[in-house]
């Protein structure tokens, strides 16, 4: 696998996921996603597709005009008949709803300010594409006020809290009995990963995407692949260098699963560690 293999594989996986999601939407949705591809990330298109799936499912299940229609049979002419009040009712619905396509005991979905704003933005983008291509002449979403997102206080760790977090990762004192059984096998990895993120401010997604040869000890920097394929070097200090050196000595002795040989941080399954696993790791300590 090459230097860009992780990000490239994510895009490939997202392409297949997007195709699957588009297959559940009306045929003209394919034109929209093809149109926005040059200026959006694959993850953004996936998010928009999920949002549109929720919207069309809502119309089918809750709007009497569309009750007799399958989702794929809803036309652009149908969408042009909607009014701002229909969109406002949809936003109210999004605050708490159940997904009819996913039966189960824990099936209630909720959206607060940020989630409502994103879903309205997805729908607005969808309508505007067809307005620009003169397939429709009326966009009810533009007449709906975007939900206001109230700023939240940013939680930052002070120096003592950072030191305590790293101490706990090294000692494992606060872990459950079950977690402590795995601690010796993951301690160097966890300390290196946390020290790197705290010491450089890189994102979790950037951290899990690192390969071994992205680390440059000669210049004390790591090569990061950011959105749009942009490559940057982020420099680190002595504490990060020490933690990485200790971990990499152990990492070199680990034979990774085929296809994950170049990954810097591995899971216990000897595969590239996932974003979700890192989030659980941080929560654990």
Segments (PLM) and residue ranges:
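Conserved catalytic core of the tyrosine transesterase superfamily
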Residues: 1-285
């Amino acid at each position: 696998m090459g230097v860009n293999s992780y990000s490239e594989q994510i895009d490939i996986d997202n392409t297949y996921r997007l195709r699957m999601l588009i297959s559940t939407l009306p045929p003209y949705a394919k034109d929209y996603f093809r149109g926005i591809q040059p200026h959006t990330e694959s993850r953004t298109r996936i998010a928009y597709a999920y949002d549109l799936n929720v919207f069309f499912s809502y119309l089918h299940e809750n709007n009497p005009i569309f009750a007799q229609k399958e989702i794929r049979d809803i036309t652009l002419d149908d969408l042009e008949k909607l009014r701002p009040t229909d969109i406002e009712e949809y936003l109210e619905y999004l605050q708490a709803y159940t997904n009819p396509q996913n039966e189960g005991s824990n099936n209630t979905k909720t959206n607060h300010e940020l989630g409502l704003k994103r879903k309205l933005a997805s729908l607005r983008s969808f309508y505007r594409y067809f307005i620009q291509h003169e397939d429709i002449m009326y966009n009810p979403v533009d007449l709906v006020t975007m939900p206001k997102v109230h700023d939240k206080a940013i939680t930052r760790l002070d120096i003592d809290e950072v030191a305590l977090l790293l101490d706990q990762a090294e000692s494992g004192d606060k872990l459950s009995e079950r977690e402590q059984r795995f601690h010796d096998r993951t301690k160097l990895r966890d300390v290196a990963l946390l020290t790197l993120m705290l010491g450089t401010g890189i994102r979790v997604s950037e951290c899990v995407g690192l390969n071994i040869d992205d680390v440059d000890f000669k210049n004390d920097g790591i090569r990061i692949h950011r959105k749009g394929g942009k490559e940057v070097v982020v420099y680190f200090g002595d504490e990060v260098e020490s933690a990485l050196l200790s971990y990499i000595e152990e990492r070199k002795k680990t034979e990774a699963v085929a296809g994950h040989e170049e990954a810097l941080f591995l899971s216990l399954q000897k595969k590239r560690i996932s974003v979700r696993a890192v989030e659980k790791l941080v929560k654990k300590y």
